[in-house]
Amino acid sequence: MKLLFPVFASLMLQYQVNTEFIGLRRCLMGFGRCRDHCNVDEKEIQKCKMKKCCVGPKVVKLIKNYLQYGIPNVLNEDVQEMLKPAKNSSAVIQRKHILSVLPQIKSTSFFANTNFVIIPNATPMNSATISTMTPGQITYTATSTKSNTKESRDSATASPPPAPPPPNILPTPSLELEKAEEQ
């Protein structure tokens, strides 16, 4: 239900296609009714051709509760403090404060589920990135630096070629016949 509710709420808040041509006198994904006038406890959300789309108090309460409690507050107090300009403080104190607050922030961005790898003591080198892309499959990216490729080329030329496999003697029908005659 938690996964479907954001989709449901976003669809409810967008302009919906009129379903009146099918014969249904409903609007807003079936949660509202097309009427000439809304009742006292109902609210008008959108238009159904020449009529009003009226939504009952339960649906209004459902939407309000979702908007109030269902959507997490991205900008909580700590983030708002972090965004304010600091007075009489050094950059080190600001950095320590930001680093202490970062684990508490829940990110809702596109990169929230992306894993990042940080390599300490990395030296900048010329690198070549090779990306393999096949439609409908996972993309794998291989990155090799100049020094790594040179080492691998040198090691490939320095190593001796593999020994050929021992020759397999396959029995021929004539040899089998000779052995059978000897017995």
From Swiss-Prot:
| Endpoints of the signal sequence | 1-19
Q: What Gene Ontology terms for biological process does this UniProt record contain?
A: defense response to bacterium
Localization recorded for this chain is: Secreted
Major localization class = secreted
Q: Sorted alphabetically, which keywords does the UniProt record give?
A: Antibiotic, Antimicrobial, Defensin, Disulfide bond, Secreted, Signal
Disulphides: C27-C53, C34-C48, C38-C54
| Bias (Pro residues) | 159-170
| Source species, domain of life | Eukaryota
> Region Disordered: start and end of each range?
141-183
UniProt entry tagged with the keyword Disulfide bond = yes
- Which Gene Ontology cellular component terms are annotated? extracellular region
Protein's job = Has antibacterial activity.
- Please give the family membership noted in the entry: Belongs to the beta-defensin family.
* Name the UniProt record assigns to this protein: Beta-defensin 129
Q: Gene behind this chain?
A: DEFB129
